[in-house]
Amino acid sequence: VPEHTSSIAHRLAALRLWFNETRDEADASRLASPPGGAAGALSLLLVAGIALSMTDAVGDASDWTHFARLLSRLGATEAAQSLAGWMREPVEGSNHRLIYWALNCQIWYLAVPLLWATAAARIPLSELGLGVGRLRAHLPAYAFLALLLLPLLLYVSAQPAFLRVYPYFDPLPGAPLWPDFWRLELLYFAQFAAVEFFFRGFLVQGLRSTFGYASIYVSLLPYCMIHFGKPLPEVLASLVAGLVLGHLSLASRSIWPGVVLHIFAAATMDLAVLWRKGLLG
């Protein structure tokens, strides 16, 4: 057998062993969980369902009008009018609406689940992936994914569907990117921390003791659905990303490498698109 063929087979065997160890460990935690865990899982799923529903109902960039109407009904007419003026500002209105969206992500994907987990369910934050876990042992896998993503991101950044969507926040015409655009990008990046916590921490880690390795699959469908409206390749890629990031979250017991990887992908895409549009010079 050629040496390179043997090396590939060895690496594939090591990868299979790593996958099986993570799956078996997650399933062992399910088998070892005390009776009555289903009630806690049901409560967690209910909170997740409310968070997803509210994000869809009032959290999109175009849904600020619901909040404005609520302010009016509460008697805060001037605040509602100020909000409307801010959202409809001719030059920066589109970015203001995206700020509204990003802040809603922080509320529904991060603050509400965290409040329930700490105040009601008494779940340690480390059990939801917010600790360092076994991060160091799995950093090479995340670094490999970043290297794998780089050429793919550079390729799709030239496609018309992605050029229309990205960057999410629009640079002001004729204005330098720093500081205004990059301040908005920081808010955009923070949104990914909330998303990673919700899907890979709250759902995957939070449901590990009830569903075992299948907690990844529980989180996969809603994760794909939040990408609806984006370019089709990105929607389909979210299924692969959900599986891979879910597995790595279970393996490392931490969401933080996934947060960094998500931010790396977003920053690379935005920089590549800005460069292709001639806005980096």
Question: Model-found features: residue ranges?
Answer:
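Generic structural microfeature
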Residues: 45, 123-126, 134, 202, ...
